[in-house]
C-alpha cells in the first residue's frame, strides 16, 4: 500500500493531507471520518465546484486535487450537494486498488476485478461500490444513476433524491468522457441536478418525502379490498406496490388489483300487501296485486267480454282474435293499429310485432299443425308431444311442462286459501278457482263447444269436452295401457292397481276408492253424503 500512497502525493495532494489520511487508517480502519470535519476544509465549496464545472474540471480553488470524506478523489462526475451528505459517484473504470484514500471494510480485498459482498448480494468492481459497502445502512440498496447503471450513495436523511445527469463512463486511468448520453453544460456552467420523485406504495410519485407520508397514512386507513375470486381481503399497500405487479392470492392463485369500494345502495321503501304480506317497491305494483284478492278486472275485451287485471293481459288477448275482427282497413297490417283500454278510455298507437300481428299465428307445430302467435307458446306446446316436464315440485316431486302449472300445484301443499267468495264465503287457493266458482252464482258459461254448442264455465272443462268429439285420450295407465280423457279418471283408475282406498265411512269404517261409492254407502246408513 506504500506505492499508491506515494503516487497520491505526487499527483497533487499535500503531504499533510496524505499523512493525515494515513493516520486515520491506522486509528480507525473500519469507520469513515465524520462529515462535519470536511465541510469547512477538505470538501470543495459549491461556488468553487461550479467554477470548476464551467471549465470542464472539478478542482477546488486551492489548485490541487483534494479527496472528500470518503477518500475518493474528485473526478469528472463527482459533485456535492449543499447542506446534505455528499453524493459520491465514481467513474466506471478505476478499481478499488487505485484509490489510496478509500478505507476498505473488513471482509473485502483491494484487488482488480469483481468483489463479493454479502451486504449487497452481488459482484462489484468499482470504488463507488466499496464506498457504499463502507457507509450505507444495512439492508439498503444504493440508488441508480439515470443515464448509466452506476450506483450512487445517498444519505438516508436527504429528502430529495438528486441524480447526476452529467454522469458518464470513462476509460481506466483517463478522464475523457465517452458516454453518448452525457448532456451539455447549462448557460451557468454547470450540469443540472434532477429531482427524482419518490414512489409511494400505491404507485403515485411525490418529489418530497413530506408529501409521501400523508399519502401512506391515508392508505393505511382504507378498508381492505376483497379478492375477486376467493373473497380474501388485502390492504391497498399489499395489493399494489410501486413498480411491481399485484400480489398473487395464496388461496386461488389469481392476482387482485385494487377496485373502488362501491357504497351500498340506499334502502328502498317497500309496500306490503295486507292480505298475503307480499311486498313491492312501487304503489302501482301493489294496486295491481290487490286486484288478485278482490277479483277486480278493469280491462275488458270489446270482442268477447273477457276481463283482465292488467292492460298488458288485454293486449295479449286481443291478438288471439282473428284478423278480420281487428282489421279496420286494407293497410292495417302495414300500419299501426289502435289499442283501446275501455276502463280508462286511453287509446294508443302501437305497431304489431314482427311475425305476430293482430290475428297472425306464424309459428306452427310440426306434429299437430296447431299455430301460435308467439314462439314461446310454441315451445311450451312442443312439450306436450315430447313429454318433457322440466319443472318439478320440491315437495312431492311431481313434474310439469309449464312454470305456471307448477305454481298452481305448489298452492295445494299449503293450507292457505287467500281467495274467498264474497257471496258464500267459500275460499280457494287459486284465483282461477274463485273465478269459476263465481260463475256458478251468476250462471255465466262463456266457453261453448263448436261441435254441439254445449257451454261450460271454464276453459279446461271445454277442452276436456272437445276430446269426446275428437277421441283423444292423452292420459294412459302405465300398468295396463288403458287411456282416459281426463287426468282425474286416470287417478281413480290407478287406485285399482295400488289398492288405495282414501274415502272411509265414519259410521262403520268401510273404505272406498272413489267418493261416489262412499256417498252411495252413506245413504244406506240414512246419513248425508260425504262433503
Curated annotation (Swiss-Prot):
Residues 1-101 are annotated as: Disordered. GO terms for biological process: regulation of transcription by RNA polymerase II. One of its GO terms (cellular component) is nucleus. One of its GO terms (molecular function) is DNA-binding transcription factor activity, RNA polymerase II-specific. Its main location: nucleus. Residues 24-50 have a biased composition (Basic and acidic residues). Keywords: DNA-binding, Metal-binding, Nucleus, Repeat, Transcription, Transcription regulation, Zinc, Zinc-finger. A zinc finger (C2H2-type) spans 271-293, 299-321, 363-385, 391-413, 419-441, 447-469, 475-497, 503-525. Disulfide bonds: none annotated. SMART domains: ZnF_C2H2 (SM00355). Pfam families: zf-C2H2. The keyword Acetylation does not apply. The keyword Transcription applies. It is found in: Nucleus. May be involved in transcriptional regulation. Belongs to the krueppel C2H2-type zinc-finger protein family. This is Zinc finger protein 837. It comes from Homo sapiens.
Amino acid at each position: 500500500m506504500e506505492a499508491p500512497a506515494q503516487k497520491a502525493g505526487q499527483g497533487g495532494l499535500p503531504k499533510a493531507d496524505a499523512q493525515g489520511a494515513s493516520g486515520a487508517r491506522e486509528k480507525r480502519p473500519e469507520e469513515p471520518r465524520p462529515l462535519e470535519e470536511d465541510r469547512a476544509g477538505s470538501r470543495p465549496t459549491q461556488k468553487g465546484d461550479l467554477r470548476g464545472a464551467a471549465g470542464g474540471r472539478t478542482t477546488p480553488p486551492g489548485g490541487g486535487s483534494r479527496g472528500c470524506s470518503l477518500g475518493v478523489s474528485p473526478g469528472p462526475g463527482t459533485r456535492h450537494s449543499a447542506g446534505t451528505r455528499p453524493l459520491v459517484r465514481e467513474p466506471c473504470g478505476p478499481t478499488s486498488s487505485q484509490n489510496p484514500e478509500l478505507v476498505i471494510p473488513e471482509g473485502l480485498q483491494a484487488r482488480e476485478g469483481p468483489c463479493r459482498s454479502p451486504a449487497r448480494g452481488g459482484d462489484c468492481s468499482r470504488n463507488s461500490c466499496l464506498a457504499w459497502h463502507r457507509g450505507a445502512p444495512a439492508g439498503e440498496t444504493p440508488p441508480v444513476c439515470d443515464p448509466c447503471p452506476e450506483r450512487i450513495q445517498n444519505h438516508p436523511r436527504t429528502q430529495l433524491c438528486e441524480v447526476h445527469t452529467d454522469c458518464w463512463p470513462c476509460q481506466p486511468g483517463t478522464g475523457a468522457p465517452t458516454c453518448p448520453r452525457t448532456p451539455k453544460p447549462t448557460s451557468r456552467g454547470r450540469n443540472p441536478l434532477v429531482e427524482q420523485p419518490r414512489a409511494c406504495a400505491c404507485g403515485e410519485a411525490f418529489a418530497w418525502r413530506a408529501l409521501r407520508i400523508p399519502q401512506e397514512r391515508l392508505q393505511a386507513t382504507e378498508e381492505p379490498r376483497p379478492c375477486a375470486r376467493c373473497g380474501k381481503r388485502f390492504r391497498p399497500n399489499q395489493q399494489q406496490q410501486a413498480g411491481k405487479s399485484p400480489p398473487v392470492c395464496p388461496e386461488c392463485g389469481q392476482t387482485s388489483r385494487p377496485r373502488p369500494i362501491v357504497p351500498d345502495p340506499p334502502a328502498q321503501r317497500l309496500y306490503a300487501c295486507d292480505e298475503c304480506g307480499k311486498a313491492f317497491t312501487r304503489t302501482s305494483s301493489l294496486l295491481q296485486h290487490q286486484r288478485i284478492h278482490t277479483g277486480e278486472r278493469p280491462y275488458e275485451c270489446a270482442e268477447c267480454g273477457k276481463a283482465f287485471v292488467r292492460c298488458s293481459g288485454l293486449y295479449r288477448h286481443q291478438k288471439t282474435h282473428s284478423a278480420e275482427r281487428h282489421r279496420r282497413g286494407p293497410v292495417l297490417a302495414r300500419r299501426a293499429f289502435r289499442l283501446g283500454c275501455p276502463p280508462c278510455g286511453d287509446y294508443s298507437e302501437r305497431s304489431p310485432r314482427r311475425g305476430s300481428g293482430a290475428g297472425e299465428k306464424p309459428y306452427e307445430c310440426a306434429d299437430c299443425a296447431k299455430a301460435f302467435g308467439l314462439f314461446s307458446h310454441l315451445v311450451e306446446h312442443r312439450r306436450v308431444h315430447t313429454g318433457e316436464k322440466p319443472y318439478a315440485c320440491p315437495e312431492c316431486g311431481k313434474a310439469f311442462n309449464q312454470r305456471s302449472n307448477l305454481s298452481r300445484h305448489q298452492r295445494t301443499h299449503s293450507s292457505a286459501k287467500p281467495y274467498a267468495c264474497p257471496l258464500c264465503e267459500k275460499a280457494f287457493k287459486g284465483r282461477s278457482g274463485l273465478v269459476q266458482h263465481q260463475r256458478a252464482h251468476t250462471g255465466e258459461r262463456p266457453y261453448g263447444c263448436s261441435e254441439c254448442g254445449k257451454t261450460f264455465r271454464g276453459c279446461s272443462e271445454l277442452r276436456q269436452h272437445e276430446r269426446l268429439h275428437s277421441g283423444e285420450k292423452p292420459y294412459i295407465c302405465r300398468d295396463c295401457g288403458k287411456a282416459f280423457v281426463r287426468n282425474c279418471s286416470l287417478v281413480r283408475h290407478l287406485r285399482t292397481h295400488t289398492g288405495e282406498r282414501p274415502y272411509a265411512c265414519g259410521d262403520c269404517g268401510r273404505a272406498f276408492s272413489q267418493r261416489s261409492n262412499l256417498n252411495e254407502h252413506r245413504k244406506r246408513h240414512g246419513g248425508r253424503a260425504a262433503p
